UniProtKB/Swiss-Prot annotation:
NCBIfam families associated with the record: PRK00136.1
InterPro entries referenced in this protein's UniProt entry, alphabetically: Ribosomal_uS8, Ribosomal_uS8_CS, Ribosomal_uS8_sf
Name of the featured protein: Small ribosomal subunit protein uS8
Family matches, as SUPFAM superfamilies: Ribosomal protein S8
Function according to Swiss-Prot or TrEMBL: One of the primary rRNA binding proteins, it binds directly to 16S rRNA central domain where it helps coordinate assembly of the platform of the 30S subunit.
Species the sequence originates in: Hahella chejuensis (strain KCTC 2396)
GO molecular function, one term: rRNA binding
Coiled-coil intervals: none
GO cellular component, one term: ribonucleoprotein complex
A Pfam family annotated for this UniProt entry: Ribosomal_S8
Superkingdom: Bacteria
Presence of keyword Ligase: no
Subunit and partners: Part of the 30S ribosomal subunit. Contacts proteins S5 and S12.
Length: 130
């Protein structure tokens, strides 16, 4: 059976691993998943990630906890295959009063909503994290 929304699967795996208090989570890798993991690491939501280039590429994400609680309180898919969400730079959402981030796929790469606003580019809102 083919996977329809691989990013939603990634976010679900992260949520489930954090609820089970796992240290790491492994999943099939893709360029988009690696780009999203890179943004999560830059923003301090995960400790690290490794993308292996085997016959079947695997992405391993090391989760981050603070005083025993997961750093990522909520990670949810915004744009999905059935309903894509494209926003202009000035229409990008602020998440949780600016405490969270929206990850946006732009013509200049995958970045946070703040970086996209600063660069003056819009794009597809992939997910929100706080």
């Amino acid at each position: 059976m083919s996977m329809q929304d691989t990013l939603a699967d990634m976010f679900t795996r992260i949520r489930n691993a954090q609820m089970a208090e796992k240290e790491t989570v492994r999943m099939p890798s893709s360029k988009m998943k690696v780009a999203v993991a890179n943004v999560l690491k830059e923003e301090g939501f995960i400790t690290d990630y490794k993308a292996s280039e085997e016959a079947k590429p695997v992405l391993e994400i090391t989760l981050k906890y603070y005083q025993g609680a997961p750093v990522i309180e909520n990670i949810s898919r915004a744009s999905r295959p059935g309903l894509r969400q494209y926003k202009a730079a000035n229409d990008l959402p602020t998440v949780n009063g600016g405490l969270g981030i929206a990850i946006v796929s732009t013509s200049k790469g995958v970045m946070t909503d703040r970086a996209a606003r600063k660069a003056g580019v819009g794009g597809e809102v992939i997910c929100t994290v706080f």
